[in-house]
């Protein structure tokens, strides 16, 4: 009869994970140690960190970004991908979303223009920049290009979702990558609720995304003006 006895197993997903609670716990633990310099280094090296972790079998790792060290669950190594992730665990993806929200809050809570300028010159979003989107498009839009921001659809005004929708429509991204955003809450609304109640807000957000100067990454406005003198007009 032993072959008919079954036991519960740990979930391999993050079912029941509350991003807002996770973010608050992150802030409590790291508020005194995290700073703009460390966040800049993280975002510029997140892809490299993922690649390095994919070669290490350890379940947890302690990458260091400048002087800031943080423990993360290593779900990038092929043999670790089905390991359970607890609600209070950090992954590179969660860390990306948390730090993007932290930067946005730092930016919005500081009315001092010199402080805001420091944030804008320190924090670089390589994904946004490669698509020609910069800080002057708006803090929420610029930061929404960071992975993990889809956990906070209300905070980022649906931009993580609508940026994804635009990229799918333009053939820049596979539709499967929208799944994470489509499972998230919007404030207290579950996905099935906001999909029916927030259509107008999502359409407005998408329209703003469509009006961005996409595809202008890599060349400054000065360089573009120079090329125009020789009859070369870039999109």
From Swiss-Prot:
A cellular component term, taken from the record's GO annotations: ribonucleoprotein complex
Cellular localization per UniProt: Virion
Top-level taxon in the UniProt lineage: Viruses
Record keywords, A-Z: Capsid protein, Eukaryotic host gene expression shutoff by virus, Eukaryotic host translation shutoff by virus, Helical capsid protein, Host gene expression shutoff by virus, Host-virus interaction, Ribonucleoprotein, RNA-binding, Viral nucleoprotein, Virion
Claim: RNA-binding is one of the keywords in the record: yes
Listed GO MF terms: RNA binding
A Pfam family matched in the record: Bunya_nucleocap
GO process terms (BP): symbiont-mediated suppression of host gene expression
UniProt-annotated binding residues for RNA: 18, 47, 50, 75-76, 81, 94, 124, 126, 129, 167, 177, 183-185
Designated name of the protein: Nucleoprotein
Source species of the chain: Bunyavirus snowshoe hare
């Amino acid at each position: 009869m032993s072959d008919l006895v079954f036991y519960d197993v740990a979930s391999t997903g993050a079912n029941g994970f509350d991003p807002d609670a996770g973010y608050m716990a992150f802030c409590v633990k790291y508020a005194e140690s995290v700073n703009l310099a460390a966040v800049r280094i993280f975002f510029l090296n997140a892809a490299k960190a993922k690649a390095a972790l994919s070669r290490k079998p350890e379940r947890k790792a302690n990458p260091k970004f400048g002087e800031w060290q943080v423990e993360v669950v290593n779900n990038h190594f092929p043999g670790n991908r089905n390991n359970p992730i607890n609600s209070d665990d950090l992954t590179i993806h969660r860390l990306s979303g948390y730090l993007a929200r932290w930067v946005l809050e730092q930016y919005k809570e500081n009315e001092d223009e010199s402080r805001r300028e420091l944030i804008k010159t320190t924090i670089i979003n390589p994904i946004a920049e490669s698509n020609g989107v910069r800080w002057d498009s708006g803090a929420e839009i610029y930061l929404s290009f960071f992975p993990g921001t889809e956990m906070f659809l209300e905070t980022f005004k649906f931009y993580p979702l609508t940026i994804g929708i635009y990229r799918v429509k333009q053939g820049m991204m596979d539709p499967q990558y929208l799944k994470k955003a489509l499972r998230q809450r919007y404030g207290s609304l579950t996905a099935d609720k906001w999909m029916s109640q927030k259509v107008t807000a999502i359409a407005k957000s998408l329209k703003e995304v469509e009006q961005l100067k996409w595809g202008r990454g890599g060349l400054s406005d000065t360089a573009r003006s120079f090329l125009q003198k020789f009859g070369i007009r870039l999109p």
